[in-house]
């Protein structure tokens, strides 16, 4: 998994992301991939999944899209309620903070179940200052 995360970070910096932005997106990817690895195959099946990163630069900035595809059990991470981060630690339910961070660090999240696969995509626009001519 580390090599995939390293590749994501390297690609983002090469595409124009700052180091902090690339690290945030790496954290997003790590959270999503870790959830898939832990939860998608409860029977312990040794399965594989796809992680796809695309970037595009335009006048608005760097558009980043991260998509994961797996054939594990159906799970819509966008349907999970956000945790109550203001609640006392003793009163909080376990779990949910990872997806909370994913939501906070990305602009959009989209899930679909198609062809017995989970497809989860997050997108983020990394604005760039306009250069005067």
Model-derived segments and spans:
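STAS-typified acidic loop motif
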Residues: 1-3
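Conserved short strand/loop->alpha-helix "switch" segment adjacent to the catalytic nucleotide/phosphoryl-transfer site
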Residues: 6-30, 34, 91-93
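Conserved beta-strand-loop-beta-strand hairpin that lines the nucleotide-binding pocket
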Residues: 37-133
């Amino acid at each position: 998994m580390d090599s995939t995360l390293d590749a994501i970070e390297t690609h983002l910096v090469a595409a124009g992301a700052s180091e902090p932005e690339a690290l945030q997106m790496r954290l997003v990817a790590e959270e999503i991939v870790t959830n898939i690895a832990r939860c998608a195959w409860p029977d312990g099946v040794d399965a594989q999944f796809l992680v796809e990163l695309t970037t595009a630069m335009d006048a608005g900035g760097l558009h980043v899209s991260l998509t994961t595809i797996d054939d594990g059990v159906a799970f819509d991470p966008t349907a999970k309620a956000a945790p109550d981060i203001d609640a006392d630690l003793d009163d909080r339910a376990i779990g949910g903070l990872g997806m909370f961070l994913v939501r906070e660090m990305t602009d959009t999240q989209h899930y679909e179940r198609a062809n017995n696969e989970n497809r989860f995509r997050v997108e983020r626009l990394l604005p760039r200052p306009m250069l005067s001519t």
